[in-house]
Amino acid sequence: IRQPVMNGVDLSCLKGVFSGGDSLSIELKKKFDKFLYDHNASVQIREGYGTTECVTASCLTPIHMAKEGSIGQPFPDTFYKIVKVGTTDEQPYGEEGEICISGPTVMLGYLDRPEETANTLRTHADGLTWVHTGDLGVMDDEGFVYFRQRIKRMIVTSGYNVYPSQLENIIDAHDLVQMSCVIGVP
């Protein structure tokens, strides 16, 4: 969107614009949606989520039903739940935990990696096999999922959990910042 070649380009032909693969900051989404609007697009960016273990995408923002910060709702026949990290205990709506996915596209396991398979695929009390994604998230009472970040990316400092993506969102909101990356330093 910063490239001069995009000045004056008519994007009214667009039918969809999608984002996945990592979190999209609220500020960047706002900037990109404004860019689309200013270039005659009738669409906004729709966020999605998925993992290799469930054959890519498994969640997407419904058309004209975006909720700020959400990656959308699970696809039909795909189930999401949030569990307390390191357990299979389901968290209540609005509580942060590990994103777990179950459904017909979930893998059978990693080839010749039984230990990794056992850590990732777990049978819960409901009898279903769930992919433990290693991602932190929240689900609201309407089934919208909010990706926070990879569990391994969390920084623990002075006994506090610090989420780099939250700090990056704040920094990225500044007009003079194009993009930021927060890392922990021992």
Language model segments and positions:
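Acidic-histidine catalytic/liganding microenvironments
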Residues: 3, 114, 174-175
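Short Gly/Pro-enriched turn/cap motifs at secondary-structure boundaries
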Residues: 69-75, 120-121, 127-129
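Active-site glycine/GP-rich loop and adjacent strand/helix microenvironment
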Residues: 59-62, 72, 91-95, 108-112
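Active-site glycine-centered loops adjacent to acidic/histidine catalytic or metal-binding residues
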Residues: 21, 50, 72, 103, ...
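Gly/Ser/Thr-rich phosphate-binding loop
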Residues: 2-70, 79
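Conserved beta-loop-beta connector loops within the AMP-binding
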Residues: 44, 81-101, 123, 139-142
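AMP-binding/adenylate-forming catalytic core of the ANL superfamily
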Residues: 103, 108-109, 119, 128, ...
